[in-house]
Amino acid sequence: DYRLCPENAFPAPIEDAKALWEHVQACSDDYGIDPARVALAGDSAGGLISSTLALILRDESGRQPRALCLAYPWVTTNNENQPSLSSCANTFPLTADTMHFFNSQVFPNDLNKDHPWANPLHAESLAGLPPTIIGTAGFDPIRDQGNAFASRLAESGNEVTHFCFESLTHSYLMFGRISNEAERACETLAVALSESLNASD
């Protein structure tokens, strides 16, 4: 449970994720886990936190996660050149108005809106990141930024497995019990993540 905005100013969520990563790495024996086989995963804003943390760990020469798994990730506050923000502006459950509201809560008065940690899509370099699984959704206002992030990661030489689930909406991970398509998407991402975690060195 990371500190939420607006009660806590950004980048508090990133700082909390980093503290948790360091704790898990330091106490892996206590938890009975292999510290070299830990992934970072998140959906929506959790995708922002996970991808930004991977960049921080890369730059600090710390142990990288074994893999990244990002579902419909929010990876930039810059909404230019994103047709999906208009074409899916009124799509359940995430609308363009809701996105603007979230932005206003996380970045009140645009404070820290241009912070590098809020915009991994536009990082100077995306090279040197772990194998990444990305699952975007066809009916999602932030579909285009997730697709662009997958493309930039691949162009930067990273191993990327990208699925665009064309018939699904934002938050499809929550709909597995009521939608067969969402259930299949969840299974697809889970299998891909398992394969990355268990791949030979």
Q: Residue ranges of each PLM-predicted region?
A:
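Alpha/beta-hydrolase superfamily serine-hydrolase fold, recognizing
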Residues: 2-201
